[in-house]
C-alpha cells in the first residue's frame, strides 16, 4: 500500500477510536476569541428535498442545512497533524483579507501554519493581512480533495468548484459578492453576514470584518442590519447568486466552499 494510503488509514483509525481531538489540533485560546457567535436569523433546516431547495432558496435567500454531507474521512484528514505531515512542505498561495484580494504570496504550508497564521488584530488592515483561502493546488492536494463529499443540490447547468482554507481567530473576508455556492466548516466556527443584491452594505473594502464588527455593526439600525448566523461543523450554508457576504472566523477554522458555476 502507498504511504499516502497508510496515512489516511492511520488517521481514520484514530478518529474512529475517539483519539482525534474535537478541534483536530487546531486549538484556539479563549483570549483570542474577540467575538461570539451572535444571533441567527438565517433559516436552518434539518432536512430538505431538492424540490424545496430549488423553489424556496436556490434563487431567493440563504439557508443553513444540517447533516446534508457525510465528511468524516475528509474531516479526519484535515486535522492539523495530518495536513502538516502530508502537505507541510508544499507551497500554498496566501491572499490578502480585503474585498478584492489583489496581493498574493506563496509560502510553505508549514510556515504559514506555524509562523504566519495568527489571530486578527483590530488595528491591522485587510490589505495587510494574508491568509490561506482559495487559490488551491488541486493536483498536489488531490489526495485530500477527492475525499470531500460536496452538497448534493446543484443549480441546473452548474458544477461545483472548491475553495479550501485555514485561518486564525478573528480573520475573515469583508463584504463581496460572486456566484451562488455553499460554505462548510470542518473545524471551528465561522460567522456569516449577508445582504441581498439590491442592498449594498456599509463597509470599507480594505478594512477587516473584525474592525467592521466593532466600528460599524453596533450602530446599524434594525432596517440596515444583515442576515447573519454562525455555522458549525456538520452545517452547510447556501448563499444565492450575487448576495453580498462577509465572514468572520470565531475560532481557528478549517473550511471549504463549493462555488456553483
Model regions: which residues?
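N-terminal accessory scaffold of Fe(II)-dependent oxygenases
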Residues: 2-236, 244-261
